Design a protein with these regions (language model features):
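Active-site metal-binding loops of divalent metal-dependent hydrolases
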Residues: 67-69, 102-104, 181
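Metal-dependent phosphoester-hydrolase catalytic domains
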Residues: 18, 75, 79, 89-98, ...
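Hydrophobic/aromatic residues located in beta-strands of well-ordered beta-sheets
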Residues: 64, 98-100
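Conserved hydrophobic/aromatic beta-strand scaffold that supports enzyme active sites
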Residues: 10-12, 48-52, 66, 153-154, ...
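Structured beta-strand-rich core segments of catalytic domains in phosphoester-bond hydrolases
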Residues: 1-61, 166-167
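Short histidine/acidic/glycine/proline-rich micro-motifs that form metal-
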Residues: 2-4, 70-72, 105-106
Length: 191
């Protein structure tokens, strides 16, 4: 894991015809977030990637963050939640609207998710329209079981959530392209 060409990463996909990247970077979910590192009791190096965007048409700006929490370390996940909130304050002193997405490897009832939910809105609960699709997001590639555990999230601040959904992307050949269902939220800037 060198932080440049190999190792853990959490990509942010965007439409370059609609959005301009103003600044971007990555930090590690560890005691030394500025360099490739494994934090606390984590099994692997874990990261959060961020990008500040400007919407070309309107000029409005926002921060997008995407992460992958450890699947083993309880201490790492609690501390990662706290670090994320610290980094939001540090990176975003102008308090731009933001999205935080990723595989948190945790269910709603866990302390790390509760920590984040104190500062950011979970789109599952803050949507104008009811959630659509399966509640669970972790498939484990098992097409015979309906996923019950939601471990992937979209959190927002400064956005209104119009709708949110979990997309059942099982193929005709009964194979999943991932062990997680994609999740999607339709959001708009608060007025």
């Amino acid at each position: 894991d060198d932080g440049k060409n190999q190792g853990e990463y959490s990509a942010i996909f965007y439409d370059k015809n609609k959005l301009e990247v103003l600044k971007s970077g990555t930090f590690w979910l560890s005691e030394t977030p500025e360099k490739p590192s494994k934090g606390w009791d984590a099994a692997y190096n874990r990261v959060c990637t961020y990008a500040f965007f400007k919407i070309k048409k309107s000029g409005k700006k926002f921060l997008a963050m995407n992460l992958h929490f450890d699947h083993v370390g309880d201490v790492a996940r609690v501390n990662s939640s706290k670090l994320i909130l610290e980094k939001i304050k540090e990176l975003n002193p102008q308090n731009l609207p933001l999205t935080l997405t990723g595989d948190f490897n945790l269910t709603d009832d866990t302390e790390p998710i509760k920590i984040i939910s104190q500062s950011l809105d979970n789109v599952f609960y803050h949507s104008r329209k009811p959630h659509y699709g399966p509640v669970g997001t972790f498939t484990a590639f098992d097409v015979n079981t309906v996923p019950k555990d939601r471990i992937d999230y979209i959190f927002v601040k400064g956005f209104e959530v119009q709708s949110n959904r979990t997309i059942n992307d099982r193929r005709e050949n009964l194979l999943y392209p991932s062990d997680h269902f994609p999740i999607l939220a339709e959001i708009s800037f608060k007025k």
